[in-house]
Structure formats: structure tokens, C-alpha cells
Amino acid sequence: MRINPTNSGFGVSTIGEKNLGRIAQLIGPVLDVVFPLGKMPNNYNALVVKGRDTVDQQINVTCEVQQLLGNNRVRALAMSATDGLTRGMEVIDTGAALSVPVGGATLGRIFNVLGEPVDNLGPVDTRTTSPIHRSAPAFIQLDTKLSIFETGIKVVDLLAPYRRGGKIGLFGGAGVGKTVLIMELINNIAKAHGGVSVFGGVGERTREGNDLYMEMKESGVINEKNIAESKVALVYGQMNEPPGARMRVGLTALTMAEYFRDVNEQDVLLFIDNIFRFVQAGSEVSALLGRMPSAVGYQPTLSTEMGSLQERITSTKEGSITSIQAVYVPADDLTDPAPATTFAHLDATTVLSRGLAAKGIYPAVDPLDSTSTMLQPRIVGEEHYETAQRVKQTLQRYKELQDIIAILGLDELSEEDRLTVARARKIERFLSQPFFVAEVFTGSPGKYVGLTETIRGFQLILSGELDGLPEQAFYLVGNIDEATAKAMNLEKESNLKK
């Protein structure tokens, strides 16, 4: 991994002699800059415009070279608002790509696309920085062994297991528990894998970014008293940012994650919320640069841009980056080029269901809609695969019977179907579990359930050994032993009432 030891502040690396150009044209966030003969900057070089506007306010805008136009002219894209810029202003070529701070100094802090802290907690150590543009790891560096990334969340580990170094799509509307699930995963990777997380907020609402930060502080994922003990670094490029910032903020977050993987040799979780906004920003940039649009108005380079981001997210012999990406599906059209291109890269999907959330079953992961390419006997083993398939079959049969139950009632079902329904309801409740990060809201301590414990629990329910226990005993518990203990307590309570 290439690291630049610099003391130059954020966004850029210093070079000895300044290469100066001047703004020739300015259209929104796009600048045309003229440089002296033979001093043209390279593609993706960072340019800095410094000066004062008409009301004597300080201007400091960083841009990225996108096109070399000829006649000593380059076209660059601004990473922040271009208010106050005028033709003829001086532009400095930094001689290098955008570079951002990396390492332990980033934990517990919020950054913008340039790696500048935006949380009013003072400066960040910038002695170790890294450029945001890198090629994906060489094939020889990759760890090709297929292994499961245990999350400690029963429904995920059993029915839609995550691949170590894989990409997972997270689908769900507002208010079904996406944020809590994300925070629990951040908490669990830190405790069980000694890993860290990087959260990339790409083109979403500023309010949501602020809410996430506040919730992370409340749940202890970000340690206010000792920032260095925090488990996550946050990088935000929100809806109000120019398209250049929204297009590059994903790369900034990924660069920070790569350092933890390659240098610290850790397992890293990289969250991208929302991957659709990355594509959307690329589409805006493409139009601004005058490229011919492709299908549905998207950029012609859609697959290339997506690939250059996704191929860097992988397992190497040093460590792994496992990525969880929230996917917005425009107009619920799964054939739209943006989600369709994203699906090609995903190893698993976690679908959150409003119906389950309404029943109070959290995490509200839909066990039938969520999928994973890892759920194969040769990868997870026969026992895990068989248990998962039987759980799905039981839940599917229950789903088919629900219309009959609603119209005719349970009594009209056959004995076998009644047993299936009873077991399915136990399974449904056993798929819920108390989260560590939700302790402050629920009052019940969080539970991390290992994969072997999860499989054992569901096998006992399916075998019929626990048919005599009430279904509420399975609700919001950790392993199956807690469910049996809860059933005994419920029985004692009911006997006392009598």
C-alpha cells in the first residue's frame, strides 16, 4: 500500500515547485484551467484554488482533473461549492491525487471527501495519508478461500450468511431498523473479530448522518470520553454536496478501510449508504463533462465506475474488507441500470421487512427474501445447509397457510399443518434477538450467538423437542437454553398467579 508521509494538511501532498494555472471558464462545479506550456497536470491530480471573493471571504476549493482538453487546458471538478470563484483566479497543481488521513487517528471522527474533520473536535494527525485512487489488489494477493463472516446475529448467520471479504446489499425502507442493524454489526465485529468499521455516507440526508452519529455516541460505538477507543470512522458526502464530492466520498471511505486491512492487518466492515447515490453522482458528473448518456440517462462508464470501487473491496492475505451497502431501488424497478449493476457485485442480500417490524420482531430481516451465495453445503457444511433449508420450508408453508387461517381459523387445519404453524411461529420469534446497541432502549442485555449455538437451537425446534414450550419463550432471547429457561420462568409466574 502506498502511504504518503506528509505534513501538508488535508486533501493534497506537497511538491517542491508550484505549478500554477488560471481559471479560463467556470460552469457550476466544472472548471476549465489553463496551464503554461509543458506543465499540464495528470488526470485525477488535485488542484487547489485559493484567494478571496468580492466580500473579502477566504476561498479554498479543491478540484480534481477529469479531462485533458488540449491547448494547455484541463477540465476539473470541484469537491466543494464554487461560490466566489472568478475567471483568472490562480490555480495550484498539487502534483498528486487527493490524499486523506488514514490509521487509528480516523476512529471516532467525521470527515468530508477531502479527509478534513467536520466534527469540531480539533485537527487530525495527518502524518500518514493515502491517495484515494488505487488499483484493486493483484490476483496473487487475494485470499481465495471461501469463509463465512460470523456476525453473531442468528437470522443472518443461519439463513443469509455473509462472506468474509464479500459485498452485502441491505434493502429496507425508512424505520425498519437499518441503522440499529448497522450499529450492531459495527459493535460485533469490534468485539468478536477485533476489527474496525468505516461508514461512508454517500449522498444521503444530513439529518440522517447527524442522527447516526448521535446514536453511535449513545450506544458506545463512538467513545466520547476516549475517542481512540471508538470502533468506527465516519466519512460524509451528503445530498447538498456537489456531485464531485458525492462521487468520490465512497473512495475516501474505502481508502481508510484499506489501510486497516493492508497495514494493520485487521478485518474491516465498510458501510456504504447509499450505493445508488454513488451512481447518481457519477451520472451528474458525466453530463457535466459532456459525455453521451447511456441507457435511462446513466453515464456510459457506469459498469467501469462501479467495478473500480467494488473490486477494491475484497479479502487479501493480510485482512479483509467486508462491505454492507444500502441499496435504494428507484421506483422499485429492479431492472433499472443502477441497482442492476450493483446486484452483479453482491454476494448476499439482507432484506428488512416492514411486516416483521410491525410484529415487533427485531432484527426485522425477512428470512425468505434474504439470500446468500454462501448457503451451499460445500461451503457451510451439510448440517448448516439442511437446518437452513428446513427453517425456510417451515416458514414458507406457514406463509402459504396464513390465508386459510385468516378465513377459516386454525381449527380447520390438519394436525400436521397445525404442528407446522406452531413450530414456524416459534422459529419466527427465535429469529429475533436483543442487540447490544439497543440495550439503552430495551433494557435487556444484548446477546452474541455463535453459529454452532444458532444451528443447535433451530434443530431442537424443528425436531419437535420443544413443542411443549410457549412461543413467547422464544421471543428476544439469545441461544436456545435461554428460551427453555424463560419458559420455566413463565410457567412459574403462571402457577403463582393461580
UniProtKB/Swiss-Prot annotation:
Q: Does the keyword Signal apply?
A: no
Question: What's the Enzyme Commission number for this chain?
Answer: 7.1.2.2
Protein name per its UniProtKB record: ATP synthase subunit beta, chloroplastic
Q: Where does ATP bind?
A: 172-179
S-S bonds: none
- Entry's Gene Ontology molecular function annotations: ATP binding; ATP hydrolysis activity; proton-transporting ATP synthase activity, rotational mechanism
Output the InterPro entries linked to this UniProt entry. Answer: AAA+_ATPase (IPR003593), ATP-synt_VA_C (IPR055190), ATP_synth_F1_bsu (IPR005722), ATPase_a/bsu_AS (IPR020003), ATPase_alpha/beta_chains (IPR050053), ATPase_F1/V1/A1_a/bsu_N (IPR004100), ATPase_F1/V1/A1_a/bsu_N_sf (IPR036121), ATPase_F1/V1/A1_a/bsu_nucl-bd (IPR000194)
Q: Which reaction does it catalyse?
A: ATP + H2O + 4 H(+)(in) = ADP + phosphate + 5 H(+)(out)
**What are the entry keywords?**
ATP synthesis, ATP-binding, CF(1), Chloroplast, Hydrogen ion transport, Ion transport, Membrane, Nucleotide-binding, Plastid, Thylakoid, Translocase, Transport
